[in-house]
Curated annotation (Swiss-Prot):
Name this protein carries in UniProt: Leucyl/phenylalanyl-tRNA--protein transferase
Enzyme Commission number, as recorded: 2.3.2.6
GO CC terms of this entry: cytoplasm
Catalytic activity: N-terminal L-lysyl-[protein] + L-leucyl-tRNA(Leu) = N-terminal L-leucyl-L-lysyl-[protein] + tRNA(Leu) + H(+); N-terminal L-arginyl-[protein] + L-leucyl-tRNA(Leu) = N-terminal L-leucyl-L-arginyl-[protein] + tRNA(Leu) + H(+); L-phenylalanyl-tRNA(Phe) + an N-terminal L-alpha-aminoacyl-[protein] = an N-terminal L-phenylalanyl-L-alpha-aminoacyl-[protein] + tRNA(Phe)
SUPFAM superfamilies tied to this protein: Acyl-CoA N-acyltransferases (Nat) (SSF55729)
UniProt keyword annotations, A-Z: Acyltransferase, Cytoplasm, Transferase
Composition bias, Pro residues: 1-10
Family of this protein: Belongs to the L/F-transferase family.
Lineage: Bacteria, Pseudomonadati, Pseudomonadota, Betaproteobacteria, Burkholderiales
Length: 254
């Protein structure tokens, strides 16, 4: 018979988060749940992410804060690039009108992520308060969008949070087949070039696992997080040369 989880802490504005070790365990109704309440502002989100905590809740719920154990993480060196997708990236790089942009349409990206249908989900966790809060994070340089553009149209992309060299993937969308995967591959090339070691994926999904992500213990994740936080962050600009982190120089030739 499973034991009852401990009472869930309710946070007042600007109150410190509980230790992540106090998050509900795998035997609870909501493994990884740490606290509720608080405020969604830049400083609270910065403190949360720097401790391995993130918000995730649905419309009508209070703000819920999570720190799962284990944690889904994509080690940048382990990104799985299948030959067929490598060919698609090469074609993308060589096709006029196809390009990667960073931070040119953050609000469009997060709105598209919020409105994208998800298998097994009837709504979205990217509720209006979340969109507004992450928009503020973007304005202060702590949230970024990686965008796939085709002939001047936004075809897909993703957004993430970045503190130093600690990167946290949030959500992605596609309007054209594989456009979000191309944006993720661009982020991987960017991260490899700048020495970013891991991308936090938060929750386990088969899609992320197929790309090379895997679960690690919370303690191991927090060690990697601390290492990333200790380093100065890169300039969030994309250079076509970053593709060479995924493709050989010969692959880039025309």
């Amino acid at each position: 018979m499973s034991s009852q989880p401990p009472p869930l802490p309710w946070l007042d504005p600007n109150q410190d988060f509980p230790p992540t070790s106090q998050a509900w365990d795998e035997n609870s109704p909501a493994p990884g749940l740490l606290a509720a309440g608080g405020v969604l502002d830049v400083e609270t989100l910065r403190r949360a992410y720097s401790q391995g905590i993130f918000p995730w809740y649905s419309e009508g719920q209070p703000t819920l804060w999570w720190s799962p154990n284990p944690r889904m993480v994509l080690q940048v060196a382990n990104f799985r690039l299948r030959p067929s997708f490598k060919k698609k990236i090469r074609q993308f790089c060589q096709t006029p009108g196809c390009e990667i942009r960073i931070d040119s349409a953050f609000e469009q990206v997060i709105e598209a992520c919020a409105s994208s249908a998800r298998i097994g989900q009837s709504g979205t966790w990217i509720v209006p308060d979340m969109r507004a809060a992450y928009g503020e994070l973007h304005r202060v340089g702590l949230a970024h969008s990686v965008e796939t553009w085709v002939n001047g149209e936004l075809a897909g992309g993703l957004y993430c949070v970045a503190l130093g060299k600690a990167v946290f993937g949030e959500s992605m969308f596609s309007r054209v087949s594989d456009a979000s995967k191309i944006a993720l591959a661009a982020l991987i090339g960017f991260c490899r070039h700048h020495g970013v070691k891991q991308i936090d994926c938060q929750q386990n999904t088969p899609h992320l696992a197929s790309l090379g992500a895997g679960e690690i213990s919370r303690d191991l994740f927090l060690k990697g997080l601390a290492a990333g936080l200790a380093e100065a962050g890169p300039a969030w600009e994309f250079d076509r040369r970053f593709w060479q982190q995924l493709l050989t120089p010969e692959s880039m030739s025309t």
